[in-house]
From Swiss-Prot:
Reaction it catalyzes: L-glutamyl-tRNA(Gln) + L-glutamine + ATP + H2O = L-glutaminyl-tRNA(Gln) + L-glutamate + ADP + phosphate + H(+); L-aspartyl-tRNA(Asn) + L-glutamine + ATP + H2O = L-asparaginyl-tRNA(Asn) + L-glutamate + ADP + phosphate + 2 H(+)
Taxonomic lineage: Bacteria, Pseudomonadati, Chlorobiota, Chlorobiia, Chlorobiales
Quaternary context: Heterotrimer of A, B and C subunits.
Any single GO BP term: glutaminyl-tRNAGln biosynthesis via transamidation
Protein name: Aspartyl/glutamyl-tRNA(Asn/Gln) amidotransferase subunit B
Amino acid sequence: MKYELVVGLEVHCQLNTNSKAFCGCSALFGKPANTNVCPVCLALPGALPVLNRRVVEDAVKIGLATGCSVASHSILARKNYFYPDLPKGYQISQYEEPICSEGMIRIDVGEGQRDIRLIRIHIEEDAGKSIHDIGEDTYIDVNRSGVPLLEIVSYPDMRTAKEASAYLQKVRQIVKYLGISDGNMEEGSLRCDANVSIRPYGSEEYGTRTEIKNMNSFKNVEKAIEFEANRHSEIIDAGGAIVQETRLWDADKGETRSMRGKEFAHDYRYFPDPDLVPVLVDDDMLERMRLELPEFPEDRAARFVSEFAIPAYDAAVLTVDREVADYFEETVRVSGDAKVASNWVMGEVMRTLKEKYLDIAEFGISSLRLGELIRLIGAGTISNTIAKQVFEIMMSDEAAAEVIVTREGLAQVSDFGAIDMVLQEVLDANPGQLADYRAGKTKLFGFFVGQCMARMKGKGNPAIVNDLLQKKLAG
């Protein structure tokens, strides 16, 4: 494409607080429609909001994590607009004085890294939800109204759709590491609007932008941005002009469609909410939140490399998700073997999670049990092949690995006499292959090992099998 793509993202992160932003109603997802509602949610006369302290603390945490300037004094404002799922007629947000500003998020792109600047992070409450798939009518569920959000607004620093996706994934990783959100895009815990424009390469002036909504996965974010960039290019090449508007992404059709003309800030008539006092963040809160920050992925990966002597690639994979990193570290503590633990978590564990669509918290084998299984391998009680059989049994059996090995008769055979006898049977049964091996076809060594292991049902000690076989074949 002869144009440069320019993208900025507005990410809405739903906080995992127990109660809503300005009242005591439950903020839990999935409750029956219109059951988590009170006079404050609906702004009924006389109902006064009170800011949830946890919302401020979470905002400070992500501000510190992204290098933002955290304001000691910020203002909650009313964002006025009319929509069926906004019963109050306004949304409590922040405008002129946000709680966090001027931060940065570093993303990995290809061979290097890029820093994406943040304009602001501000507190906001969510709106309700319109439901269009029940008969011919539209229904309103206001359970979500008042659920706390943090809006993370970037500068238009992204130049490809992949960079935008990488940025969004990094935001998700940060909020999950902080423990302030589950980052679930399918449930709407993490939503993003993309501001997209194009300009000729070398130009410093921004083109007219469109805002894209309704993207519920990282892949859809990429597809929507790429489609919109191509649409802009085609319009400009045909001599047309881009209309500044909000567009919806239709994942089924793979295209965007016009939703409404793009609003400007003055259209919302922001003004300080007269029912809410300013948000004050003192030095004590800043220091307390700083002490609560976790070890972030980059630092944790570096520690894994130095402390456990595992490859940098393994460390990077294991620290993408905080819960997986915790699981791995506990497995190492129990097993005493970081490299084997790394192989198992990156291999069997992650494969199972992917196949069964599970999070690590839902996984049926605890880090303690996996560590005990790895310890049996290290002790020579079972081979790695048998360990995989035990692993599959452990998925549906809560017994310890050692109990399963004993019960199923899976202990490794290390008796030299027993292994020697089986090897002799294999050689006697395959005289042709034996002659070929001794004639120079040494690749048949693996054939003999396989035959021996098959006769011993995988329980032969591999080191002893290999050693004895080499001696027999040389005789």
